[in-house]
Amino acid sequence: MTQTESVILAHTRRCVPAESCGFVVRTPEGERYIPCVNISAEPEAYFRIAPEDWLRAEMQGEIVALVHSHPGGLPWLSEADRRLQIKSALSWWLVCRGEIHKFRCVPHLTGRRFEHGVTDCYTLFRDAYHLAGIDMPDFEREDDWWRNGQNLYLDNMAVTGFYRV
């Protein structure tokens, strides 16, 4: 566990039963956590970061992740969390049950325009599994690989942790 992650977990414990919130910022000195005050009218169910806290974090370096917690909740982003994450275009780190779950920002699964290697079939199910907390590696693939008799999805299943049952 990194020092940043330790600071995040300590902040989350201090905030219970309210949701904690803050930012992971990359500074010239390295990565650090900037805790924020949850100004939500219902802090035990939602979080809201004051614009001043957002600006304070941006002034310290590049914001690389927004962090919040689900005390007593589930270890994945809610529907509202996902909408806000997409608007923020940031990775979101979620603290739940003493663990940090890291969610990279992925676009909505429906309505995507097909682009090989960017928003293709593998990217779609890789993103869907990611939203469920399962990370799958990306792999290099040339366009039209399926026309040469290859099946990169099945060939790479073992690498992603899947196995035949």
Model-predicted segments: where are they?
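Second-shell loop/turn segments in exported
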Residues: 110-115
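Conserved beta-strand-loop surface patch within small alpha/beta domains used
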Residues: 1-65, 71-104
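Short, surface-exposed amphipathic charged segments that create phosphate/polyanion-binding patches used
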Residues: 105-109
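...with weaker cross-activation on analogous glycine-rich loops/strands in unrelated enzymes
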Residues: 142-165
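Glycine-rich phosphate/pyrophosphate-binding loops
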Residues: 64, 136-140
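Active-site nucleophilic cysteine motif
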Residues: 116-132
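Histidine/lysine/aspartate-rich catalytic loop segments that bind and position anionic ligands
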Residues: 127-133, 141-146
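Short secondary-structure junctions
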Residues: 31-32, 137, 163-164
